[in-house]
Amino acid sequence: MSGMFITFEGPEGAGKTTVIRKVHEEMERQGYAVMATREPGGIDIAEQIREVILNEKNTKMDAKTEALLYAAARRQHLAEKVEPALQRGETVLCDRFVDSSLAYQGYARGLGIDQVRSINDFAIDGTMPQMTIYFSITPEEGLKRIHANQGREKNRLDMETLNFHQLVREGYELLIAQSPERFHVVDASKPMQDVYEEVLRVIQDTLKKNQI
C-alpha cells in the first residue's frame, strides 16, 4: 500500500511550519500513520546542503548553483526518507517541495520554470505530491511576520528585496493556474488557529476520499 504525499508551499513568513507541526501532532493523536519533514533538509545529508544554501554568508551563490543544490538535497531526501515512508503506507507532510524551486529559482531568479523543472524531473524521478496546500499571503505581510518573530530561523532568502518576494508570489500563482486540481489555496492572513483547522479538515477529507 502506498501512502499519500502532501506538500506545503508559500512565501516566507506564511506560517507553514507552525501549522504543519500542529497538524502532524493532531493526526498522530488520532492514530494516523503520518510523518512530517522539510526541504531542504529532513535527513543529515540534506540538512548539510541546507546549511550551504541558506547560510547568510553565501551571498555570491550563483542562481544555477542554488537550483542544483536544492535538487540534490531533494533527491537524497526523497530516496532516504519520503519514498520509504510512502511505501510503508504513511502520509507524508512535507514543508516545501519542487514547486518552491520553480517559484523561487525558476521564476523569481529568472532561470525559467521549464529549465528548473528539467533539473528537478531528474531529481524526483516521477514522485509528485497528490495534494499541495499553498499558504497565500502578501509579501509585505510575510516579511513583517519574519521581522517580528525573533525565534524564527533566519536565512539568506530573508535578505532578498520585496520585489524578489513579489516575483515568488507571481511564480506560485502561475503554478497554481497550471495545476489547479493539485493545489488547495489557504488564506494565510487569517488567524493561525483558523488556518490550522482548515488545513486539518482538507487533509482528513482527502485521506477519507482516497480511503487512507
Curated annotation (Swiss-Prot):
InterPro entries recorded: P-loop_NTPase (IPR027417), Thymidylate_kin-like_dom (IPR039430), Thymidylate_kin_CS (IPR018095), Thymidylate_kinase (IPR018094)
Enzyme class: transferase
PROSITE patterns the record matches: THYMIDYLATE_KINASE (PS01331)
Keyword GTP-binding appears in the UniProt entry: no
GO CC list: cytosol
Keyword ATP-binding: yes
GO terms of molecular function: ATP binding; dTMP kinase activity
Amino-acid positions noted as binding ATP in the UniProt annotation, renumbered to this chain: 10-17
Listed transmembrane segments: none
Gene Ontology biological-process entries: dTDP biosynthetic process; dTTP biosynthetic process; dUDP biosynthetic process
Enzyme Commission number, as recorded: 2.7.4.9
Record's catalysed reaction(s): dTMP + ATP = dTDP + ADP
One Pfam family this sequence matches: Thymidylate_kin
Its biological purpose: Phosphorylation of dTMP to form dTDP in both de novo and salvage pathways of dTTP synthesis.
Similarity comment: family membership: Belongs to the thymidylate kinase family.
Listed name of the protein: Thymidylate kinase
Organism of origin: Bacillus pumilus (strain SAFR-032)
